[in-house]
């Protein structure tokens, strides 16, 4: 296929798509140029159905540092594992694409996005999402798209699509919305306490922009799209399905309605084990034994799925007996742990999260060096999900994509209420340990995080709570569920997480298993979530009504001083010698930013005070008319040099030592003497002149003799070579005439 180019303008920037030139052996590939961001997307599919009971879709977003004209960090100077931002972007693309494959599709699919050039004002992640959908759509892979996504900002009361870097920094909203031309199917957002009405408006306007991108994709697919391949879908034997349903459906219905999670799981597993044993014996010698037993497992899963959904939509009964808008029992505890800087334990039904706060000097901030300019990340929220939380064994190691994503969601929700750096100059880390899970653990971690921050004395603007909403839809009717548990999440159509304060929303995340949801469903879900959020906030505020006025005794204390930027090098010293000496002498930690803000941290206030004194002395400047208790450090014929403070010396000229004439400096002072002096002059080179006599009482004026002349010869001070006197001009008799 020859190279073809398609072009349009979107959100004020040129959008160009190229096909048929590169990566031609992939099932589908495109180069997307948006502004000056360039992304290559290639989609490939395996020839055969993969084993396993899930769809093996892999989406990668690869940031190449050359795209921004940068070297990778580290010793190897080569890209390694994906950054957190790259992982989150890959998840962002995966989520709206995954529902667009047919039920039973099991071929492995990989969608690889490579950022080739990067323009911070033209969203590369959105170009990658566009490219992922388009590469799948023009390929022979059976993808029921296209989809598209946009970023949405809110600046000065205006909704902005794909905001620039400058607009994004001013925006009260950071929203990504994706969907088909018919409905929204993915949402990810952080917001500065915006109302449900503004969030809904942003979602709907974002979807209108999505439709523009989909229309452009459809134009390209019509021109270059391939015919879709015929692939085998996973189907179960219809006769076998009918046989099992007739014999065992009533047993499974009873098991599903057991209210307690572990007991319900045991009851349903007992039914499945019974059915499995029967058919293992029945077909033990059958040549298609493996296929039959795979079908048995799939049929039992479908039966449980259908019964949970029937209970909710028809009987209006949830598996644990709650109403559709009812929250599970809540409990909140602070100070669960001693010694740490703050802790909170939050329990909702059988979901429980422990959040632990750690405060540290700003030197502990995380340095983020990706495609954007390097910056320091002050707040971190990490989420851990051990397998024991669901009573299972499993893999332990580095956090996976799910843990990274849930941590980022909690981070967005809580970051909106944190104090500014000026108000609270600490690096802040929250770690959420999920101790039990039966759905909505990410939202429990947000609630526990609020408790830990308040207990730790972090002056947040307001408490934040989170709730997960669900959806059961049969195409014509739907039911929105409040506070979904694991079974409802697994068999439901939507997981819609909403976090916020009493004043507004701080984070949203929505994933669905159907191809989209309507504005009506969104409106209802947001309204139910608000009601539930307020109920949870009632419990949090009853546990800890306000932020504690002081930090924990184990938390580092902090004091800050401001110094001139040109004094930073004095405090640091050659090779860090001076600052290292201060740290060694006092035991504190010191951070200095490029604006001259010096932060001193220690659990010992006396150590902080000592370090402050040393630094203040290093950057102290003498001022004219100020008086100092100085020490004589050197004597010359023309005067004495005195130390005012630290490394700052001044000259007291012999003429400034006393009101009477003195021939020898040694007659008045000796090395080591302490004298009071007043600074009388600082020249442009910083040389300081001081005076002792300025602090002494002036002697009375001498009496005049009969001829009108002074009885004593006037004093004329001597001057040394470093202090040349200014020329003085006096009037001569000729001039006066």
Curated annotation (Swiss-Prot):
Residues 556-615 form the KH domain. Residues 691-737 are annotated as: Disordered. GO terms for biological process: mRNA catabolic process; RNA processing. Residues 715-724 have a biased composition (Basic residues). Mg(2+) binds at residues 489, 495. One of its GO terms (cellular component) is cytosol. Residues 625-693 form the S1 motif domain. Keywords: Cytoplasm, Magnesium, Metal-binding, Nucleotidyltransferase, RNA-binding, Transferase. The keyword Cytoplasm applies. GO terms for molecular function: 3'-5'-RNA exonuclease activity; magnesium ion binding; polyribonucleotide nucleotidyltransferase activity; RNA binding. Its cofactor is Mg(2+). Residues 700-714, 725-737 have a biased composition (Basic and acidic residues). It catalyses: RNA(n+1) + phosphate = RNA(n) + a ribonucleoside 5'-diphosphate. Coiled coil: none annotated. Its EC number is 2.7.7.8. HAMAP family: PNPase. Belongs to the polyribonucleotide nucleotidyltransferase family. This is Polyribonucleotide nucleotidyltransferase. It comes from Streptococcus pneumoniae (strain 70585).
């Amino acid at each position: 296929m020859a190279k073809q180019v398609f072009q349009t303008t979107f959100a004020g920037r040129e959008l160009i798509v190229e096909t048929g030139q590169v990566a031609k052996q992939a099932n589908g590939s495109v180069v997307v140029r948006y502004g000056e961001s360039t992304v290559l997307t290639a989609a490939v599919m395996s020839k055969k159905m993969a084993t396993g009971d899930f769809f093996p879709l892999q989406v990668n977003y690869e940031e190449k540092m050359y795209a921004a004209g940068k070297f990778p960090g580290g010793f190897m100077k080569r890209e390694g594992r994906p950054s957190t931002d790259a992982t989150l972007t890959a998840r962002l693309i995966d989520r709206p694409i995954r529902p667009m494959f047919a039920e039973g599709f099991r071929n492995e699919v990989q969608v690889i996005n490579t950022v080739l050039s990067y323009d911070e004002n033209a969203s590369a992640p959105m170009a990658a999402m566009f490219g992922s959908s388009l590469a799948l759509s023009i390929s022979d892979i059976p993808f029921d798209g296209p989809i598209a996504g946009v970023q949405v900002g809110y600046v000065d009361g205006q909704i902005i699509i794909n905001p620039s870097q400058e607009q994004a920094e001013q925006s009260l909203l950071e929203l990504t919305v994706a969907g088909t031309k018919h409905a929204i199917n993915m949402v990810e957002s952080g917001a500065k306490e915006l109302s449900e009405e503004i969030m809904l408006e942003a979602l709907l306007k974002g979807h209108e922009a999505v439709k523009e991108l989909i229309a452009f994709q459809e134009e390209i697919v019509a021109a270059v799209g391939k015919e879709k391949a015929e692939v085998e879908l996973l189907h179960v034997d219809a006769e076998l399905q009918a046989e099992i349903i007739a014999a065992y459906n009533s047993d499974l219905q009873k098991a599903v309605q057991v209210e307690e999670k572990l007991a319900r799981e045991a009851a349903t597993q007992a039914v499945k084990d019974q059915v499995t044993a029967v058919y293992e014996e029945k077909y033990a010698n059958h040549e298609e034994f493996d296929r039959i037993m795979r079908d048995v497992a799939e049929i039992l899963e479908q039966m449980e799925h259908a019964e949970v959904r029937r209970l909710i939509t028809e009987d209006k009964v949830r598996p644990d007996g709650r109403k559709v808008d009812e929250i599970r029992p809540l409990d909140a505890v602070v100070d669960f742990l001693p010694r740490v800087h703050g802790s909170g334990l939050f329990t909702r039904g059988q979901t429980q999260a422990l959040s632990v706060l750690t405060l540290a000097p700003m030197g502990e901030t995380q340095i983020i060096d990706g495609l954007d300019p390097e910056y320091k990340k002050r707040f971190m929220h990490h989420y851990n999900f051990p397998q024991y939380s669901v009573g299972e064994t499993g893999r332990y190691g580095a956090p996976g994509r799910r843990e990274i994503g849930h941590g980022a969601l909690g981070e967005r929700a809580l970051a909106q209420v944190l104090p500014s750096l000026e108000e609270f100059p600490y690096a802040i880390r929250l770690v959420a340990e999920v101790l039990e899970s039966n759905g909505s653990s990410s939202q429990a971690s947000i609630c526990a995080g609020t408790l830990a921050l308040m207990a730790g004395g972090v002056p947040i603007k307001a408490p934040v709570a989170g709730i997960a909403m669900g959806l059961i839809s049969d195409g014509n009717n739907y039911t929105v569920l409040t506070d979904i548990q694991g079974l409802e999440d697994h068999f439901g159509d939507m997981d819609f997480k909403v976090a916020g304060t009493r004043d507004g929303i701080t984070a949203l995340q929505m994933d669905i298993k159907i191809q989209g949801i309507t504005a009506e469903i969104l409106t209802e879900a947001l309204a139910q979530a608000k009601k539930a959020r307020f109920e949870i906030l009632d419990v949090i505020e009853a546990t800890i009504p306000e932020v504690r006025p002081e930090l924990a005794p184990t938390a580092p204390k902090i004091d800050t001083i401001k110094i001139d930027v040109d004094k930073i090098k004095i405090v640091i010293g050659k090779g860090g010698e001076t600052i290292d000496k201060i740290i060694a002498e006092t035991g504190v930690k010191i951070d200095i930013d490029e604006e001259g803000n010096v932060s001193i941290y220690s659990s010992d206030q006396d150590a902080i005070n000592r370090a402050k004194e040393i630094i203040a002395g290093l950057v102290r400047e003498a001022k004219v008319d100020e008086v100092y208790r100085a020490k004589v450090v050197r004597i010359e014929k023309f005067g004495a040099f005195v130390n005012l403070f630290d490394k700052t010396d001044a000259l007291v000229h012999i003429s400034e030592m006393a009101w009477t004439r003195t021939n020898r400096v040694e007659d008045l002072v000796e090395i080591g003497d302490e004298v009071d002096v007043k600074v009388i002059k600082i020249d442009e080179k910083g040389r300081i002149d001081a005076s002792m006599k300025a602090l002494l009482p002036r002697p009375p004026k001498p009496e005049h003799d009969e001829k009108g002349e002074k009885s004593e010869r006037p004093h004329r001070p001597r001057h040394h070579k470093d202090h040349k006197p200014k020329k003085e001009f006096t009037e001569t008799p000729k001039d006066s005439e």
